[in-house]
Amino acid sequence: MAAYRADDDYDFLYKVVLIGDSGVGKSNLLSRFTRNEFSLESKSTIGVEFATRSIHVDEKIVKAQIWDTAGQERYRAITSAYYRGAVGALLVYDVTRHVTFENVERWLKELRDHTEANIVIMLVGNKADLRHLRAVSTEDAKAFAERENTFFMETSALEALNVENAFTEVLSQIYRVASKKALDIGDDHTTLPKGQSINVGSKDDVSEVKKVGCCSS
């Protein structure tokens, strides 16, 4: 169960990045999850910003530091710093603009080029409330997610549909993979000091966790 907590009260800190084309709704997903706000006049993010929110996972407090940047090509120079240390990602496209879904493959390659193979990835089809304008089918997106071994959800930042679920699923999976990795090496990741970064293991570890609950829509 997710809950708002004081910023300094947490057991683990995970960096999660939002990626995808400009205008797909990344900033509104972030503000909906962290502040329960939505702006119809949202402008393109200039540079980088991040927000935080803590949730409960298995009686531990997991704090997400969620980074957001504009998708325009001219900001690609910040790529390395943006991705560094990320253990989770939400790869966002707009269900009403097919080109944003076509570009998901490029974003995914860039993400994997700059992060560890074990990163937990959620493919997110945003603006699902605009049913009459849909240009990307749920089936096509789900097939892509299964092929690329990522999680998948459709969301609406406007209606707050699945926004909570998408972020909490990513954070829960990061926690579970990290816990399994610690168990495999005979350590207990729940005893690590506050703020210590977590190596969430290999890509196989992520795949194994995915078998439990993948690709809900």
From Swiss-Prot:
It is a lipid-anchor. GO terms for molecular function: GTP binding; GTPase activity. SMART domains: RAB, RAN, RAS, RHO. Signal peptide: none annotated. A lipid is attached at residues 214-215 (S-geranylgeranyl cysteine). One of its GO terms (cellular component) is plasma membrane. This is Ras-related protein RABA1g. The gene is RABA1G.
